[in-house]
């Protein structure tokens, strides 16, 4: 067994592709962002009041995945903070990862030096502590909420409303919010007051074209790859493939990185067009199939309950999903889980992009979730039937 390890390590030592592969990862912010000069300029102009200790407008930033929204925002804010360290506090939160109002407020408080328990307090109490903390000193707090479409889909827009109105309760400090979203249509579903407050200023990020992606890859390959390991033709191929996928720079960088990893694994010192095509297949491997196949049993049963329920409905509520789930558990002779746990599973399926669970307000009936599939029904059925014999047996009954 150690011979296998030695052989792999020996091959990897021969590969001299990367100078620093970390510079191809999404969280790396380069010193220059090609073809985003207009967006950088506009964001700096909007935020300029902080240099005079004045509150800037709230900003809504739109654009598809991989169009540079997060990179530009962090680039501008980190540069402003370096130039004006005492003028403002910058807090960045990805709301897909910190996906509850409680966690968001807890992270904001912790960034301001206030520790809070992981659970146990109400959001109202957290807001109260937030206001109290801000009223103890004088600053501008810029809160960047990335991927807010994920937050709004799960929990509605109440936290956005409260954050954009919090300045009415502040005497010395002020708060501005930068909202970043991949889903332009999400804005249509916001409370008009939230839409008005958060969208005081807007910046649109268009997709990159193939030539622009090529420039980005050339810039990044110079610092991330060793000299001479990739040709201009191979860079053009990576750019062209990513341009087909709505001009996604993240996709282009992933293609470059995985192509390099393939060449390096095989002990070569040159990335070829074949490596790029193999990387494309590797990246496009059916993510949905793999995610569903590895779900726990009850998560699969909840998912199949949603599929069956949507045969006769365009959307489902959590209660309707739970009713179907109970019947299926009975048919299979397994002990059912609680409705609360089913609700948690629905949130988890939404988080990984298998379903969409949108919070809607039904007036006097309160808030509920409207659940629908975000992927092909056929893929769901195929992956569950092939990965779980017990649930697969439902189709033979």
UniProtKB/Swiss-Prot annotation:
What CDD domains does the annotation carry? Answer: AAA, Cdc6_C, HLD_clamp_RarA
Coiled coil (residue ranges): none
Task: Supply the alphabetized keyword list.
Answer: ATP-binding, DNA replication, Nucleotide-binding
* A Pfam family this chain is assigned to: Cdc6_lid
InterPro entries membership: AAA+_ATPase (IPR003593), AAA_22 (IPR049945), Cdc6_C (IPR015163), Cdc6_lid (IPR055237), ORC1/CDC6 (IPR050311), Orc1/Cdc6_arc (IPR014277), P-loop_NTPase (IPR027417), WH-like_DNA-bd_sf (IPR036388)
Q: Which Gene3D superfamilies does UniProt cross-reference here?
A: 1.10.8.60, P-loop containing nucleotide triphosphate hydrolases, Winged helix-like DNA-binding domain superfamily/Winged helix DNA-binding domain
Q: Which PANTHER family match?
A: CELL DIVISION CONTROL PROTEIN 6 HOMOLOG (PTHR10763:SF26), CELL DIVISION CONTROL PROTEIN 6-RELATED (PTHR10763)
HAMAP family of this UniProt entry? ORC1_type_DNA_replic_protein
- The identity of this protein, by name, is ORC1-type DNA replication protein 1
State which gene encodes it.
cdc6-1
